[in-house]
Amino acid sequence: MLAYHGSQSLKNKLLTQIEIHRKADAIVAGTYGKLNGQWKGCAVGCSVRSLDIIDGKLGDCINNAWAENIHQRLSERMGIPLELARLEDTIFEGLPESGPKGKVRAHWPTQFAYAINPGADLTLVWPKFAVRMLKRCVGYAGSNERSVTAINGVIALFERRIAGGVVTLAEWQTARVYAAAAAHAAAHAAAAHAAAHAAAAYAAYAADAADAADAAARKHEFARMADDLLELLRESK
C-alpha cells in the first residue's frame, strides 16, 4: 500500500477540499458527520467526505451507514495503514480547540494530509511513533517498576517489528493486558493515557482525566504526539 496510491494529484485535491471545510468552520470534534444547515465533521469525517466530493459520490453522508468502517475506508482511499487513520482521529479529538496562536484542532486534518508524501510506504510509521511515545512514558513512570517493566516490554515488541521481525497476536495481547494495568498505576495521567493507547494498538483503551490539571496535561501530550507523527510522516518516502 502506497500513500495516495502514488498520486500527487489526489493529495492536492484532498488538501483543497479539507481547506474548504476548515475555512467554513466545518471541522469539529465529536462527530464523523452531521448536517444542521451546514455539514460538519471530525478529521476523519472531513477527509472521507472530501474524498467523496473528489469522486463525485456524496450521497447521504450523515447516516449511520456512512460512518461504518470509516477508518478502514480512509485507510484504503488514502493508501495509509489503518493504524494511522485511527491515530489521526485519536489525536484530533485530543488536541485543544485553540492555543496562543489561534485554532489548533481544526488545522490538524490539513497538517496530517500535507505531511504524507505520495508513494510513501508508511508501514513502519506507527511502530516508530509508538516507540517514541512509550519511551517518554518510561520517564514519566519514574520508580514505578511495574509500569517501567510493562512499557519496556511493549517497546521491545515494536522495535522487533521495526527491525523486520514477527510479533505474534498472543504477544500483543499479553503486552496489552500488562501495559493497561501499568498505565492505571502510572503517576502521570498524560503518560498513562499515552502508554495505554500505544500498548493497545490492537485493542480499545482510554484513560479518563481526573481533574482540570490532568486534562491540560493530556492536551499537551496530544500536541507532542501530533508533532511526532507529522515528523515521521514527512520522513517517510
Please annotate each region the language model reported:
Residues 1-184, 188, 193, 197, ...:
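Short, glycine-biased loop/turn motifs at secondary-structure junctions and
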